[in-house]
Amino acid sequence: NIAPKGIEFGLGGFYTYADNDYKMKSPFQEGLTITRDHDKFKKTVIGGSFKARKWWFDLVEFEPVFIHTYKDIQGIESNIRHAHSHSNAFIFANKMEKENFLLDGLDLDWQLGYIYTDYHFADTASHRTHWDGTHYPAVSEFGGEIGKWASLLTNEKHQLQHKLNLNYLVNENHSVNFNSLLKYAHANPRDGMKDKVIGYRTDFPSNMFSWVAGLNYDYRTSNDKFLNSFNVKYYYYSMKTRMASVLVKTAEDIDTHKNDFGISNALRYRITPSLMAKASFGYDVRLPSEEELLGDGYVIAPAGNLTPERNISVNIGMLFDLTGKASSNLQIELNGYYMHLKDMIRFTGGFLQSQYQNFGEMRTLGMEAEVKADMTRWLYGYVNATYQDLRDVRKYEQNTTVANPTKGSRMPNIPLSLIHI
């Protein structure tokens, strides 16, 4: 540290190594004891930090980070012996903060991040191995232990993310906030071995850009009895790539540009100093993430034609709060909520590759109760009970005019009720 100049330096890192071999009885062959190995894992992380607190900005921070990861692929049903992956990530982050930026009452928070990753997956073994050690043919004439083809994948990604938050305090009753989140991602997957097996190229470069901008206005009374927060958002995203299936040779050009608006309002009213009522409603949009759109180049196929999720929601609740007013710091909260989600994005498995897809419409009705308290000076108690009824409300099967046979049915693999203690 250089304290008089407000400058701090930092350097750190860690190394992780795991290689846990163990024996177990085979669930596939009676009387056979197998050794589970090929699960080596290595990770190296090195990072640095530079902070300046006495420049024109209140805080200027730079952080470079390097991450290297190696992982053996361990089979569950099959005895994978050679397939493995490794990756390198180079990360650079910059953050700047300034109170009273350009004018009194205006606070700035700026964040910029760049990530470069190169991911490699190798599955070119000349044969597969049974649990008893005997060999049998690879998945293709070019080798491979997993899936339906050999693979020698390289996937390079460039990601750029920028966050900006400007908060302006007009006076004790009014404040305005502007926030912006911009993301850009470029992926370039290449797998010549897979192309050899299939006979044509299925992985192509992709470019994704998204921007979410929001403007928020808060009004609160001088006695803090009433607070209202009104928010509007603008959403934009574009995706340019080519998509080809491992089953269809022809590649489809994808050049998507979509935009939308969102609006929400939340309010709360203090009935007593410890009891408040709250409510909110909104129309929100969730843009597809970089992982959902670009996939990983191997197990997860790109989904450049995804549509943003759109959600209408209503929430009503009560909060009884004794935090700082009693030794128990008791909090009791009750909420009821309704959501209608369109174009829900979900992960769907496939015979050869999995992919994220738009599902359709889903309606949610729910209630939630939560109690938190300090039971003693050293014991904290927490219990949460949730009831959630999620229903498929699609009229038709996805992208067809065929009536949906599961309309009105509960969504699978989502619990109707749950309790956390």
Model-derived segments and spans:
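Membrane-embedded beta-barrel scaffold of Gram-negative outer-membrane proteins
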Residues: 18-20, 270, 278-282, 308-365, ...
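Residues that define the transmembrane beta-barrel architecture of outer-membrane proteins
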Residues: 1, 40-46, 86-92, 156-160, ...
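Gram-negative outer-membrane beta-barrel transporters
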Residues: 331-332, 336-340, 357-418
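Face-selective signature of the C-terminal outer-membrane beta-barrel domain
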Residues: 50-68, 87-247, 252-264, 268-272, ...
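Periplasmic-side early beta-strands and strand-to-turn transitions of outer-membrane beta-barrels
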Residues: 1-83, 405
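Outer-membrane beta-barrel translocator domains and adjoining extracellular loop/strand segments
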Residues: 22-29, 63-67, 72-80, 120-129, ...
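Extracellular loop and loop/strand-boundary signature of outer-membrane beta-barrel proteins
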Residues: 31-36, 74-84, 97, 146-152, ...
